[in-house]
Amino acid sequence: MEKYVRIATPEDAHRLAPKVRKADIDEIKASNNITPLRGLLYPFTKLRHKTFSIIGTKEEGVIGMFGVVPCETKDFGIAWLLSSEELINHTIQFLRECPKWVEEMGQDYKYLYNYIDERNIVALKWLEFLKFKHIETLPYG
């Protein structure tokens, strides 16, 4: 795999949306009641977004998208990731590269955050691996 992560395009969102993981679909439905496509296209509506695509094999194509969008609160950025089940085929490379991309996403912000559905165990473990801190649990929905 030559280029694993690159700057995302709206076309990438259209390619990834039909194959987003069920846990991610459930999470964006619970939090914002939107479709995967709408969630993936949302960052492109923000001026200071950083949005990247994770590319698998030639057959897999786009297997994930992630990035950061500005928050209304100064110094805060909202980090996010949506992926397909195919990302599991690239776990080692994904985990190895994550810290540098989190650093890239955080360059313009003092804090990165997001809300995670507690049922999304994979996302919670990933954030724990990246040393994100759990601040509080809030009821939602």
Descriptions of predicted regions:
Residues 2-18:
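A short beta-loop-alpha structural element at the N-terminal edge
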Residues 53, 60-71, 76-80:
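Conserved beta-strand in the GNAT
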Residues 115, 133-141:
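Conserved catalytic-core motifs of GNAT/GCN5-like acyltransferases
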Residues 22-41:
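Conserved GNAT-fold acetyl-CoA-binding loop/helix
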Residues 90-104, 125, 129:
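Conserved acetyl-CoA-binding loop-helix of GNAT-fold acetyltransferases
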Residues 41-55, 62-64, 110:
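A short helix-loop-beta-strand connector motif used in the catalytic cores of GNAT acetyltransferases and
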Residues 106-116:
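Conserved GNAT acetyl-CoA-binding A-motif
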Residues 75-88, 93:
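Conserved acetyl-CoA binding element of GNAT-fold acetyltransferases
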